[in-house]
Amino acid sequence: MSKKTDEILDSLKSLSLLEASELVKQIEEAFGVSAAASAGVVMAAPGAGGGASAAGEAAEEKTEFDVILESFDAAAKIKVLKEVRNATGLGLGEAKAMVEAAPKTIKEGASKEDAEALKKAIEAVGGKVTLK
């Protein structure tokens, strides 16, 4: 990479979650794009081709998982909320709405390792999670 892109990457690494969220919003406004739309396109691509052979491969070993918050202990709501914020990078209000809407998909297309780690983290603080 060029020196300029290395510097930008280093700057991005130092951002807090709140700053990163604000940056995403500014990029969306400046370039007329949506971060959510990009994720939808990525999610649609694996199912787009292959037909029966793709279904056979999926039956062998699934590589992408959706992490779904099914429910949570009311006393642990704040802890679950913090874990959801850490996993998604959402702001407080957005994460709160997501948690309160359980059952709700909190992460789509996660690798097996990431999905399992997130499931363990949320269950450790009082949430009930399923992987699909």
From Swiss-Prot:
InterPro entries: Ribosomal_bL12, Ribosomal_bL12_C, Ribosomal_bL12_C/ClpS-like, Ribosomal_bL12_oligo, Ribosomal_bL12_oligo_N_sf. GO terms for biological process: translation. GO terms for cellular component: cytoplasm; ribonucleoprotein complex; ribosome. Signal peptide: none annotated. It comes from the Bacteria. GO terms for molecular function: mRNA binding; structural constituent of ribosome. Pfam families: Ribosomal_L12, Ribosomal_L12_N. The keyword GTP-binding does not apply. Keywords: Ribonucleoprotein, Ribosomal protein. NCBIfam families: L12. Forms part of the ribosomal stalk which helps the ribosome interact with GTP-bound translation factors. Is thus essential for accurate translation. Belongs to the bacterial ribosomal protein bL12 family. Homodimer. Part of the ribosomal stalk of the 50S ribosomal subunit. Forms a multimeric L10(L12)X complex, where L10 forms an elongated spine to which 2 to 4 L12 dimers bind in a sequential fashion. Binds GTP-bound translation factors. This is Large ribosomal subunit protein bL12. It comes from Prochlorococcus marinus (strain MIT 9211). The lineage of its organism: Bacteria, Bacillati, Cyanobacteriota, Cyanophyceae, Synechococcales. The gene is rplL.
